[in-house]
Amino acid sequence: MAEDLGELLVPYMPTIRVPKSGDRVYKTECAFSYDSPESDGGLYVCMSTFLGFGREHVERHYRKTGQSVYMHLKRHIRLKATGASGGAFPKRINGRLFLDLENNTEMNTEDYEYEDEAKLVIFPDHFEIALPNIEELPALVTIACDAVLNSKSPYRKLDQESWEEELQVSKFANNLVQIDNGVKIPPSGWKCSKCDLQENLWLNLTDGSIMCGRWFCSGSGGNGHALEHHKQMGYPLAVRLGSITPDGADVYSFDEEEAVIDPHLAKHLAHFGIDMLQMQGSENGVLDNEVKPRVNEWEVIQETGLKLKPMFGSGYTGIKNLGNSSYLTTVMQVIFSIPEFQRAYVGNLTRIFDYAPLDPTQDFSTQMAKLGHGLLSGQFSKPPMKSELIEQVMKEEHKPQPKGINTRMFKALMSKGHTEFSSNRQQDAEEFFLHFINLVERNSIGAENPSDVFRFLVEERTQCCQSRKVRYTERVDYIMQLPVPMETATNKEELIAYDLKRREAESAKRPPPELVRAKIPFSACLQAFTEPENVPDFWSSALQAKSAGVKTSRFASFPEYLVVQIKKFTFGLDWVPKKLDVSIDMPDLLDINHLRATGLKSGEEELPDIAPPIIIPDDPNGRMAESLLSGSGSNVNSSFKGAQPLNLPFGKKEAKLLRYMERMVEKFGFKFSVRLSVEIDFAEPLIIPGCGTVTSTSSHGQNALLNQPPEEIVALICSMGFPRNHALQALRATNNNLERALDWMFSHPESEEGADNVSGCVDTENNPNGIITDSEQEGPRIKDGNGRYELFGIISHAGTSTMSGHYVCHIKKEGRWVIYNDHKVSASERPPKELGYIYFYHRISC
């Protein structure tokens, strides 16, 4: 028999591999579905690629690759048979254990046991070889099988990729001298004390000075003033502002010339009024000081105490919590309740799977289709077995109905390369939503882009207070952020009385009084959104100098789906993250037509489109800037010998472009730095005229919109060595967003197809107020229409900070509200409309 098996496997020996240290073995989950060894059909692991496939998908992999040898893993769950001592049998595979296969946490391990079975299966005849079979199998096959069975989870390798290099404790930390000069650092509004830069800022831990970093530090430019200050004063340690969290911060030692650990960081920051001690978390991941005062919020959001009826079937599938992953699960539940996302991924599931790359675990569309099908098929959301069948089933083999799906593979792909999302910490759902939209757009080139439904244009009107002249610009956005004006609370007297009782209870060490929450009218939030905003350090092109400025924002277009974020999270003066505990009467029906932008009004005079002079510093890293500005190409051997202002005919967008060029090309291996004599707001992506910055000429913006990149922008990108056609294609494919265009060019091979096609970027969908669009357009579209909406989704947060707590979402389906709380899905009795964090509205007809 041994010779027969050896001869049988001879043709397949070249395709059987032993996993190496860098290989990922997916033996717990199918690449295309949520099948696992516990599924009825078990899981097939390819012995060449080590990818896992359910019974419905293994044939596709065989046909596509010709790979014939798979290891079939099957886990049986049975009632525990106890021995004389009452102990449990271990999980086993014919006398051996499956390693690194987690137990089903939904099964009580005191009542059930696991029996694991493995065998080799040869396709297409499905010839089976039971394992282990050391005597009859060739040595190489035995070694390969052992390596697969003993392999660790691939997600442990993914977690290791996000680990940072181990840092050492600074030799200056224990005896750091701090000057008692009365300096207290506010939680925002920082500037370099020497050049007014507002990014890449470092706080010196000795004297509290705030100065900018060196060139290319933390992905952005600086003038090196923090290092100069150290050379002058000798103060050794600095912390990067914006990196401070409860777990620490980025600390740099100038003397040791490396990033270091400061074990006394909380003490050193407290010297300057930054209190981190109150931010320390407890073992359960919830801040210690948030539990008692927030109990009421947790109960209301999760509808605790109410008899909620479980929901099952298509669209009512829960998602298991991986540990602080509720920010992701709530967003994805809402996303796949939207028809456009359902059609784009689940509707095209067969095509997406058939054309998936050889490693579908790393393909965005495949994993989106997999998740969408898992949530919408109902396969993983089945009601419990009927009571009369339970006894019969338990006598044979228990087959537990799956409760929710495990999104570990999906999360690993979504968070790849992102420090925060790849961690196990709780995150901001709003930040993940924007991160997700960015991934959708990057992976929708040449295909349907379902994120079009969220995109809208914002018109920003900025007025110089001295000259009274104005500038109208437009930018793309996906979220309407509403401020919370606490001063408009309608129950101020109750709040004052509650605060007094709370203080008395604390001093007397009594239980706190019943919580009183500030009641803020939604109309007040909407009014605050429309209020003029002061623009600090506004550079007026009319005055050719800094001046006071004010900015107002309006909608240049209304999206198909409106996402509204309530800006609840902020920092107190003590640097402790705070969540505004408010109740807002969010409407079920919302009409924002009165917020439609009007464009330049009669009698208004526009500011000249001129930017301040650009200063090229005395730095060898400025060679690329010289080549760009001189138009001499990228191969320049000389450098500027002295810093000098260049009065170039650049508008503000070109100045902003240069800064983005500096940021972006660094990660692709270039060195490029430009110092601007004016600070420009880089918080928003650079959107170049075209789809991204359309100038409306009427209330409905009925001007011709063409996604044609400006020639000067194309020329600047070409000067980096990119072919013109490639630059045009990238800009059109990314809505003229330079940051994404550069990333697109490095991740997509040059393609000449469609490079010279010009198409529109607005889809009105039979809207008489919109603009006719070319159906073959490449760039993202603006789906304009009326501004009347109906609420259909709510993401709520329980806790005091986005760094902790828990997210729950409520979605309106089939006329009723449903609560999605991790793997639990139930009919909602009291959706917490007044306590939500992110609200989702869909457009309704007038």
Swiss-Prot record:
Superkingdom of origin: Eukaryota
Record EC number: 3.4.19.12
UniProt entry tagged with the keyword Ligase: no
CDD domains per the UniProt record, alphabetical: Peptidase_C19B, UBA2_UBP13
Pfam families: UBA (PF00627), UCH (PF00443), zf-UBP (PF02148), zf-UBP_var (PF17807)
Known catalytic reactions: Thiol-dependent hydrolysis of ester, thioester, amide, peptide and isopeptide bonds formed by the C-terminal Gly of ubiquitin (a 76-residue protein attached to proteins as an intracellular targeting signal)
Family, per entry: Belongs to the peptidase C19 family.
Name the UniProt record assigns to this protein: Ubiquitin carboxyl-terminal hydrolase 13
